[in-house]
Structure formats: C-alpha cells, structure tokens
Curated annotation (Swiss-Prot):
One of its GO terms (cellular component) is host cell membrane. The keyword Repeat does not apply. Keywords: Host membrane, Membrane, Transmembrane, Transmembrane helix. This is Putative transmembrane protein ORF119. It is a multi-pass membrane protein. The chain crosses the membrane at residues 9-29, 73-93, 95-115. It is found in: Host membrane.
Amino acid sequence: MGLAPSLATLAIALVFLGISLIFLVPAMVQGLYSIVSGVFSVASSVSNETGCPQSTEVVQLSNQTASISVPSQYAGIYTLYLSFISFVGSIFTDPIALIMLILVSLIITLFAFYYKNQG
C-alpha cells in the first residue's frame, strides 16, 4: 500500500534529504567550484586574446578522469571540460554519492506523492 500521504511521509522525506545532502554536498561543492573557477579563467583568457593565437605550443592537461593534449590557447576551455567530466564522473563512480543520488530522487518522488494527494 505504501506510505500514507501525511506529515509522516514528509518527515521521512526530509530526514532522508538531510542525510543524503550531508554526503552529496561536499563532492558537489568541490566539483562546482572547479567548474565555476574554470568558467571565470576561460572568460578572462578570452577577453585577453587579440584574435590570433600567439603560440602553438601543446599543453598536457590531466586529472583523475582523463588526460588530453591541446594547443595552449584552448587550455582553459579544456580544463573546464575536464573538470566537468570529473565532476559528473565522481558522482557516478563514487558508490556513496550514487546511492545518495538515488535517495534524493526517491525523496523528490515522495514529495510529489505527498503534494499530489494534498490537492
């Protein structure tokens, strides 16, 4: 029969949400910080460009997920790309984070169930 759409359902959902956020937030904050700082460094390097590439040297970029060789003028964009990949990858390769992601989706379903039955 499932959980009755009551305040108990809402309380259980909130408890699960709190527990899952404790585990998810540190990984997400770290990943989002690297993405945001990457966006700002790309924006500043693009605004400093004169239109033609100054150098054709190749730089090696790597993190725990991937490794890539790119021309140096595109290094900022590819660093951003790599940080995004590692952010997504860290959520899906870390078992605790994956479990928490599943929990969060279940919680959202519980909330939807609760509010649907309120109306």
